[in-house]
């Protein structure tokens, strides 16, 4: 779980959650601001969607950002174990960082995410879930 933050003049951001070990089980939610309450609301929405799709998220890996520090609340919302990476160790959550890098291909650094519609965020999630990954390309070539 991580945030992709709007540019310096923008507001809000995107909350991203990738199911560990499954880069194609990913969720994106738009946040109007970066406060804990907004993150909790977005997490509720993600968990509802995961439940509808019959996806079980058993554990979540995130960084030590202030928006993720309410461990008990997040565990209550997600019903999953929450693990934190070490400070400045983004490689410890490589799949989410790679997912965020792909988002930046569509929406560069200066993007104001508060101006995105919820439909645009849904479309982005669908695109990225089906986005070809290098491991998939190797498998297709070998077949």
Where would I find each of the regions flagged by the language model?
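Short small-residue beta-strand/loop micro-motif enriched in glycine and branched aliphatics
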Residues: 23-29, 84, 109
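Short, surface-exposed connector motifs at secondary-structure boundaries
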Residues: 23-25, 52-58, 106-107
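Active-site beta-loop-alpha junctions of metal-dependent nucleic acid enzymes
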Residues: 6-10, 18, 28-53
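A glycine-rich, aromatic-flanked flexible loop/lid motif
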Residues: 10-22, 72-75, 96
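Mobile-element integrase/transposase regions
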Residues: 1-15, 109
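Charged alpha-helix within mobile-element recombinases
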Residues: 72-143
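Mobile genetic element proteins and their domesticated derivatives, centered on retroelements
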Residues: 2, 17, 24, 43, ...
């Amino acid at each position: 779980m991580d945030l992709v933050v709007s540019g310096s003049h923008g507001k809000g951001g995107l909350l991203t959650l990738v199911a560990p070990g499954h880069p194609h089980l990913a969720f994106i939610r738009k946040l109007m601001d970066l406060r804990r309450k907004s993150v909790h609301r977005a997490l509720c929405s993600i968990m509802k969607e995961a439940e509808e799709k019959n996806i079980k998220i058993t554990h979540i890996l995130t960084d030590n950002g202030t928006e993720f520090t309410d461990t008990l609340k997040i565990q209550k919302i997600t019903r999953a174990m929450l693990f934190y990476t070490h400070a400045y160790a983004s490689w410890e959550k490589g799949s989410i960082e790679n997912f965020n890098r792909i988002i930046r291909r569509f929406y560069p650094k200066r993007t104001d995410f508060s101006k995105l519609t919820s439909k645009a965020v849904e479309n982005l999630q669908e695109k990225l879930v089906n986005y070809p990954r290098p491991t998939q390309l190797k498998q297709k070539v070998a077949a």
